[in-house]
Amino acid sequence: MLELASGTGRLAYSLIRDGADYTGIELSSQFAELAKKKLNKYSNSQNILVGDMRSFKLDRKFDLIFIGFNSFLHLLNDNDANSFLSCVKKHMHSQTRFIIDIFTPNPLFLYRPEGIQIPVLEYSDSVSKKIIKVEESNKYDIDSEINDLTWHFYDDEANILFTENFSMKMYFPSKMNQLLIDNGFNILNQWGDYYKMPLNDTSKLQIYNLSL
């Protein structure tokens, strides 16, 4: 199997532990190294490669290819998305299944009042052991369909520590369907959650099970 945008090995860990024939591609060399350290007790942990998912070439085909946790949404324009999907197709055979996991855009999320910050998570800092709170603000461009997000990190006394900025392309189901069909994929299933319930108007997720 092949995971694209494999990150720090969050999904790879259980797959490799259970003996899967796993390969991961990750753009960040730092994330790839963290994944290898996490998985170094397993013989196939070195199959995590640094590469660009828009232009990779592995000279083999896989039974299963997947991209999880909204990573597809970091492809911010049609050229990047088309290049990615073209690369995926070159690594598929007639029985390959390709899984894409993204969230369904929510207008309440996209069109927040400017400057509003919404709590998204809390975690314990590994060094200071203090609780760090993260709040999110965003600005959505309806023409480009790109959502620019800022995460604001606060300590437990509400002092701002730092911010992180990132952008995500928003795909509504109709646009996603058209993109996949135009790129030559068969949509076998569209699920709205991890329990494989059919995608509907209230689904928070879009999970696509695809073939050639």
Each PLM stretch: what is its role?
Residues 66-68:
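A conserved beta-strand element that flanks and buttresses the S-adenosyl-L-methionine
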Residues 57-64:
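A short acidic, Gly/Pro-enriched loop at the edge of an enzyme's catalytic core
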Residues 73-75:
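A short His-aromatic
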Residues 1-5:
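Conserved class I S-adenosyl-L-methionine
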Residues 99-177:
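SAM-dependent methyltransferase
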